Every structure is written in structure tokens, then in C-alpha cells.
Amino acid sequence: MKIKELWNKIRKGVKAGMAAVTESNVLTDNRVVSMIEKFKASGKYKLMQEGERYYQVDNDIKNRKITRKVDGHKEEETWRANNKLAHAKYKIQVDEKIAYLLTKPVTYKTDGADKNDTYVEKVKDVLGKHFQYQLTQLGYEASNKGIGWLHVYLDPKGKLKTIMIPAEQCIPYWSDRSHTELDAMIRVYNTTVWQYNQEKEITNVEIWTKDGVKYYRLEGQMLVYDNDKSMDAGGPVAHYKSVEEWETWGKVPFIPFKNNQIEMPDIKFVKSLIDGYDLGRSEAANYMDEVKNLIFVLKGYGGQNLSDFIKQLNEDRAILIDDTEDGGVDTLTPQMDITALREHYEQLNRDIVESGQSVNKDLDKFGSAPSGVALKFMYSSLDLKCKLMETEFSRGFEMLLYFVDLYLQISGQGDYEKIDVGLVFNKDMAINETEQIQNCSNSQGIVSDETLIAHHPFVSDVEEELKALKEQKAAEGPAWDTAPPVKDDGNGCLLYTSDAADDL
């Protein structure tokens, strides 16, 4: 075989292989339906639902039924005490985390290429004044569901807007195993419509790619193409409309804001411990409520079934005795080990704090007014957890800037693609204010004024404070930094002018 023939065969083989790979990445209707079913049945989807439920304190203990086996089958004992004490420990941990990382306004940090902060101001203007609130929303979403999704679009006026899409509606189709770039996004959500005066629920499916979007309805196991939404004036719709033509962003307009690198919600790490805490406290409450905690010594009782006796006693608070002379009921009271029970609760509580990386509020160790070092130790686990989210959110903001830069270009506001802007998360930690102010005072001349202001306990918005200081210095400048005009009286003496005297 000649070399040329061999080379042609190799080229054909490579082309066939590339075609096979391309074909394997095509999202056909059957593949989309399969991906939807697989996602809805996955452990990740279940965790999203659990995270949302437990944040609303709808814990599993609320579904508890007390049963016993009767003649080989389970029977619910509705007459027994069944306290369902659901504790809000998970909600407290999530609120604590978001309040620590995302409630204080973020600071936009740029390199020296952005003169007069022109680019930063345009970024802030495009994202809008509510972007901080949107970051907080994404923080809750990522904490409860492992990931939050921000969708980028243009409104009817041509302004760039962003909206958070619930994570349980989004099925990402990643282009790589590290989940850094999307090939497509499948969004599934239900809407209610009226048909002949009856409500009907429709499952909508959107398939977003780098080239545009297609709309479907899911009916059973089949995708039905929605031509009205997918086509406009005879042509397919894309990401946004520029004048009269549809355009694309060049990327899938969905941005991930992850809770951590593995996209796991916080409930994953504490659910079993919280369930144990709920169960233990509920059992203790049942013990205090139920008559079963007394051991009954029956004399002359005519019934044969002890279950009927307990049931009758709980419902009627009385029993019938056949032998009126020698019959009766004596009771023995078992002792409850309160000390062991308390130790169990306290250990579970410590385990929840440790596994959930929450603030250690043990005042026995740190006292009622802990120092700065003690406070840092108390917040160390929470700070570690928040740093993981901070890294992922910084990456998400970097992806968002791609769309902001492109929007600034197409709207004729300039090309800022080569300028880097990052987010600085200003954490809100309880501090010893007196100690912090003293440290800031001692650091003057060693670090920049901006750093000192960022760490001063009285400052809530660093950028606003810097702007206020600049305006204050400009207003005070002529009074303290300008020498008053003088004139010679002819005898070699210098006199202040009248204008200068008036200023003194």
C-alpha cells in the first residue's frame, strides 16, 4: 500500500471519529427527555428539595408516625403522644453564613488600567443598584441547593438584565469534567394555563446553546416543538434582538454561582445530625406526655389484650375492674436519666456546629466579651466555609463580566475587555470595636488609607466613605492648606490683606 493511500485512510478514520464525537454531543429529543428523567430521579435533585425544606424548618420529623406490629402488620398508634419538634438549626447556619459574607456591600477592585474608575462605574451602572441583593439571593440558592444560576438577557428597552433561575429547573450540559463551561442548558418548569375554563399544568422545556434557544412542551415521553416561541418572522430566535435581527452572546447565557467546588448544598453535611436532634427532643417530650412512662401492676383486670388497656387508659383516662374487692391498679414510676439525656443533646449540638462549620458560641470557653483573637477563633470554621463560596462567586462574577463587556461594546459605550475587575467581599464579623479602632490607629502610615477604612468598625460602605473623605478634604482645602495673601506696608513689614483678615 502506498503512503498516500494509507494517509487518506487515516484521514477518513479521523474524520469519522470526529463526526462520531460530534454526533454523541448532539442533544436529540430522546436524550433531552432522558436527561430530564435522570435529573429528577438523582440524589442531587433530592438534596435541592431537602435543602429548601430544611431552610423552611419543614424537617423530616414532621412526617413521623408511631407504629407497632399487630398480627404481623404495622398499625399506627394515633392515640399515643407524638411530638414533632423541628429545630431551625440549619436555617440559622445558612442565615449566619449569608449575613457574614454577603450582606455588606461588595467592593469592586480593578487594576491600574481603569483610569478614574470609568469601567467600574459602567459595570455598576449596568448591573444596577439591586445587584447586591441578587448576590444575596444567589448565596441562599447555592447554600440550599449547591448551585445558583444567573440568566443574562436584554429587556424590551435593550438594557442588560439578570435574573436568578431556580436550580431545580436547570439541567446543565457541561463541556468539561471540571464544570467550568457550558455546552447547553436545559431548563424545565411548569406553568398553569386555562383551557375551556379548566386549569391545566404544562411542562415547558427550553434548550439554550451558544447559537440560540429552542422552546418545547413535554407531553409524556415526547418533546413537542413550540413553533410560536422558537420562530420569529420566519426565522429562528436567538439570545437577544438587536434592531430587527436576532443575535447571540457567543456563550450560553447562564452563569453558575457554586456553593463549593463539588456543588453540594450545606444540608448534605448536617441533615442526619439534625434529624437525630429532632428525634431525641421529640422522644423526650413524648416521655413527659405519655402515660406509658408509668409501669402498671393490674389486679382483677378483665381484659385480655394489654394494648387495649393502654389505649383505653389514654383515651378514657379510666379502666374497668372485674374484682371490686381485691382488684386494682398500682403504678411504678421509672426514672429518666436527665443527665445522660442532656449530655446527648449537647454533644449532638456540638456535632451540628462542627459539621456545619458554624460559629462556635460556647461562652464558657471565650467569655461574654471575647478579644479579637478569640473572635477570630470562634469564626474560623465559618470563615473557611465562606472562603470556598467566595472563590466560586468570584469565578461566577468573572463569567458575568464577559456579557457586561459585550453589552458595553454593542451599545457603543466602549471596549473594556482588557481591564480586569474583581469583587472584594467585605465580611461582617462581630468584633471588639475598641481593639479594632486601636489597631487601625496604630497602622496609620504602614498601610493605605483605603485598607484602614475597610477595617474600621464604623464604616459600612468603603467606597462611599472614601468618596465622602475626598469631598471633605476638597471643601476644607482652602481653609487649612492655603497661605493667606499678604502685602508690604512700605516699612518692611508684611500685613494680611483685608480679605485674609476676614477669613481669620
Each model region followed by its residue ranges:
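Extended, helix-rich architectural segments
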Residues: M1-Y173, T180, P485
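Conserved small/polar residues in nucleotide/adenosyl-binding loops
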Residues: Y496-L504
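Long amphipathic alpha-helical coiled-coil segments
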Residues: L401-E417, S448-E465
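Long, highly charged low-complexity segments enriched in Glu/Asp and Lys/Arg with interspersed Ser/Thr
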Residues: H456-P484
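C-terminal structured domain segments
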Residues: M429-T451
